[in-house]
C-alpha cells in the first residue's frame, strides 16, 4: 500500500501516507519497507529529511541481506551522510550487494577501486566490476568501461571495444557517452573517421547541456567539419559551454571576440573570457591574454603582466608561450633583458618545432659566447627535467 501511495497508482500520490504504511511494515521487520522508508528520509519525501534516520533504516534492511539497502548504506558511507564518512565500511556494504549481482553496487565498488578509496587502487578490478554492471545495462558502467578501454587502464587499450561500450550507453541516451563516442568518430579511433557522425553525437549530448559536447560541436562549426562552417553557430555553442565553466570554450569564445568571427569584434570581451579560462589554469588562454596585454588591444597595455602570463603557459609546456617569453627576455620587455634565459626558452620552443623560436635561437646566439650558449642549453635540459617549473 505504501508503494502505491508513493507511485500514485490507484490512489492520489501521497508521500506522507507512503511513509505511514512503510513504517508499519518496517517495524514488523519487512526489509523492502525498511529500505523504502530510508529512501523517503534521505529525500525528505513525506517526512522531514533526516540522513541519520535514513541510514538507520537502510542498516536494518541491509543486515537482513537486502541488496538495495546494502548499496544505499554504502552510498551513505561514501558521502558521509547520516554516518561518519568511512570508505572501508562502504566497500563492505557494496561488496555484499555486488555479490548479489546488484548492478549499482558493482559500479560503485568499481569506482572505489578506481579511486583507491577504502581499497588498494586496482584498475583491473575496476574493469571487472564495471563489466558486470555494464552487462546488466548500467549506463554509467558502460560509459566508464569505455573510458578504461580508451585509456588502456586495467585492460589492453582497444578503441573498438571503447566504441562498443560507449555505443551501448549512447543507445540509452547518456550524454557523456554521446560526447565520448563523438570524439572517437572525430579522431577516427576504433571507428572510421566521420565528422558528420561526430557532429550528430555531439549535438545529442549538447542538447542535454553537456558542456564538453557543446564545446566540441562549436569546434566543428568553427572548422567546418561535418557541418557547414558557421562562426555564429560556433559562438553559440562555445558560449553555452563557457557559461558552464568549460575553460576550452571560454578560451575559444575569446578568440572569436578577438577576431570578430561570429560576433562583433571586442577585445575587452575577449579578455573577459580569456581571464575566466586563465583562472582555471588554461595554458592557451594564458598565452592569448598575454598577447592582448602586450599588444594593448582595447585593454591596458602591461608588458610585465604579459610576461607573467606567458610564463604560466610556458611552464605548462606551450611552445608558443615559451617562444613569446624568450622574445620578452631577448628584448627586455616586461622582464630584465637576459640573452641566456631567452636562448633557453627559444631552445625549449624550438625543440617542439616552433619555427619562430628556431630563427630567434640562431639570431640571438650570434651575440653570445660559447659558455653562455652551453649554460643556456644546460638550463633548458634541467628545465625539461623539472617539467618546465622554476626554470628561471
Specify the residue positions occupied by each region the protein language model found:
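N-terminal segments that cap or nucleate solenoid repeat domains
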Residues: 1-4, 392
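Hydrophobic face of amphipathic alpha-helices that form TPR/SEL1-like repeat modules
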Residues: 3-7, 36-43, 72-79, 108-115, ...
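Short helix-capping/linker turns of helical repeat alpha-solenoids
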Residues: 7-9, 14, 22, 27-30, ...
Amino acid at each position: 500500500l505504501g508503494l502505491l501511495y508513493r507511485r500514485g497508482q490507484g490512489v492520489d500520490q501521497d508521500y506522507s501516507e507512503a511513509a505511514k504504511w512503510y513504517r508499519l511494515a518496517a517495524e514488523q521487520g519487512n526489509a523492502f519497507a525498511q529500505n523504502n522508508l530510508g529512501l523517503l528520509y534521505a529525500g525528505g519525501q513525506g517526512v522531514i529529511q533526516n540522513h541519520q534516520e535514513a541510514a538507520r533504516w537502510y542498516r536494518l534492511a541491509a543486515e537482513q541481506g537486502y541488496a538495495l539497502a546494502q548499496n544505499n548504506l554504502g552510498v551513505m558511507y561514501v558521502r558521509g551522510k547520516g554516518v561518519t564518512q568511512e570508505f572501508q565500511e562502504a566497500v563492505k556494504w557494496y561488496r555484499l550487494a555486488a555479490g548479489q549481482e546488484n548492478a549499482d553496487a558493482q559500479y560503485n565498488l568499481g569506482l572505489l577501486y578506481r579511486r583507491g578509496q577504502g581499497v588498494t587502487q586496482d584498475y583491473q578490478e575496476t574493469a571487472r566490476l564495471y563489466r558486470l554492471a555494464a552487462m546488466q545495462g548500467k549506463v554509467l558502467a558502460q560509459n566508464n568501461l569505455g573510458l578504461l578501454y580508451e585509456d588502456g587502464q586495467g585492460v589492453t587499450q582497444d578503441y573498438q571495444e571503447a566504441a562498443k561500450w560507449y555505443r551501448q550507453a549512447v543507445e540509452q541516451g547518456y550524454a557523456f557517452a554521446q560526447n565520448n563516442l563523438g570524439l572517437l568518430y572525430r579522431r577516427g579511433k576504433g571507428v572510421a573517421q566521420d565528422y558528420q557522425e561526430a557532429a550528430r553525437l555531439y549535438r545529442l549530448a549538447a542538447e542535454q547541456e553537456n558542456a564538453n559536447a557543446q564545446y566540441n560541436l562549436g569546434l566543428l562549426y568553427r572548422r567546418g567539419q561535418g557541418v557547414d562552417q558557421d562562426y555564429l553557430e560556433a559562438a553559440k555553442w562555445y558560449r553555452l559551454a563557457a557559461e558552464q565553466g568549460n575553460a576550452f570554450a571560454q578560451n575559444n569564445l575569446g578568440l572569436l571576440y578577438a577576431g570578430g568571427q561570429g560576433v562583433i569584434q571586442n577585445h575587452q570581451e575577449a579578455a573577459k573570457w580569456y581571464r575566466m579560462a586563465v583562472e582555471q589554469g588554461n595554458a592557451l588562454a594564458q598565452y592569448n591574454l598575454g598577447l592582448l596585454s602586450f599588444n594593448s588591444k582595447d585593454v591596458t597595455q602591461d608588458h610585465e603582466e604579459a610576461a607573467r602570463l606567458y610564463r604560466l603557459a610556458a611552464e605548462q609546456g606551450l611552445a608558443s608561450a615559451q617562444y613569446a617569453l624568450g622574445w620578452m627576455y631577448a628584448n627586455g620587455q616586461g622582464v630584465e633583458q637576459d640573452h641566456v634565459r631567452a636562448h633557453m626558452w627559444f631552445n625549449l620552443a624550438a625543440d617542439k618545432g616552433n619555427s619562430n623560436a628556431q630563427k630567434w635561437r640562431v639570431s640571438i646566439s650570434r651575440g653570445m659566447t660559447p659558455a653562455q650558449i652551453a649554460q643556456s642549453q644546460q638550463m633548458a635540459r634541467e628545465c625539461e627535467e623539472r617539467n618546465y617549473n622554476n626554470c628561471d
